[in-house]
């Protein structure tokens, strides 16, 4: 029978597994000269893939509203978010994930400002429906992955890189993520979307697509930065 949805395993909700799964797909499809682009948690997968497997075959990397480099506040990462915030999220998901999703998607789209202007009630509801249909195990297990430390992974990113982030992102604040990611990758280009929430791929799709087209169509040469250095 054809597979119409993803499986819902009880283990493997970590970035090493995500990156390994992506690597298997790359090898199976014999991909070469491809772009790795990730949104939100997906940006962490891009970083971990590069950290584990390098850039062979990868021409560009794109991070959109992404969680790297390291969201957790620690002694050597004072720019991060207090751990109690993530613990509170886990507690809320465990107690009533459906109620949590309602508040989450309000901040995902900044509905208090953008509902009826850049996002419809139906689009927000569709996102809630998708989240509600996800594995309860995955919904809970993914929260700690939000504050994975990707700093060593980003150090291995040696391809032209684009970072796109909204300056009004309430889920993954730009100051703790996008701005720092761009500063850690030599030559990375940062595009800040004015008034953009977390889901700029929906609310500000035109701006995101324009940035992607300009970046990917610019004819960047993978080795250019290495030679320049």
Feature map (PLM): residue ranges:
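Catalytic active-site module of serine/aspartate enzymes centered on a nucleophile-bearing elbow/loop
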Residues: 186-229
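Conserved alpha/beta-hydrolase catalytic His-Asp/Glu region
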Residues: 69-81, 91-155
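Short beta-strand/loop motif that positions the catalytic acidic residue
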Residues: 157, 163-165, 169
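Glycine-rich phosphate-binding loop signature in dinucleotide/nucleotide-binding domains
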Residues: 26-32, 157, 215, 219
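Conserved alpha/beta-hydrolase "acid-adjacent" motif
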Residues: 170-176
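Flexible "cap/lid" loop of the alpha/beta hydrolase fold
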Residues: 47-95
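Acidic beta-to-alpha connecting loop that harbors the catalytic carboxylate
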Residues: 167-170, 195-197
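Active-site loop/oxyanion-hole signature of alpha/beta-hydrolase fold enzymes
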Residues: 1-41, 50-52, 57, 210
């Amino acid at each position: 029978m054809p597979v119409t949805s993803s499986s819902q395993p009880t283990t493997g909700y970590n970035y090493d597994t995500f990156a390994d799964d992506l690597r298997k797909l790359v090898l199976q499809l014999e991909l070469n000269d491809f772009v790795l682009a990730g949104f939100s948690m997906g940006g962490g997968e891009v970083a971990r893939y590069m950290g584990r497997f390098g850039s062979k075959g990868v021409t560009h990397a794109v991070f959109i509203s992404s969680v790297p480099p390291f969201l957790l506040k620690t002694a050597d990462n004072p720019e991060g978010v207090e751990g109690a915030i993530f613990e509170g999220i886990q507690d809320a998901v465990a107690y009533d994930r459906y109620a949590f999703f309602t508040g989450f998607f309000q901040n995902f789209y900044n509905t208090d400002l953008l509902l009826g202007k850049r996002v419809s009630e139906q689009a927000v509801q569709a996102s809630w429906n998708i989240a509600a249909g996800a594995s309860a195990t995955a919904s809970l297990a993914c929260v700690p992955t939000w504050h994975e430390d990707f700093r060593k992974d980003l150090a291995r990113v040696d391809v032209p890189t684009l970072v796109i982030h909204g300056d009004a992102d309430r889920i993954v604040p730009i100051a703790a993520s996008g701005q720092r990611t761009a500063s850690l990758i030599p030559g990375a280009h940062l595009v800040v979307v004015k008034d953009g929430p977390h889901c700029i791929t929906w609310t500000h799709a035109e701006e995101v697509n324009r940035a992607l087209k300009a970046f990917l169509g610019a004819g960047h040469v993978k080795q250019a930065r290495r030679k320049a250095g």
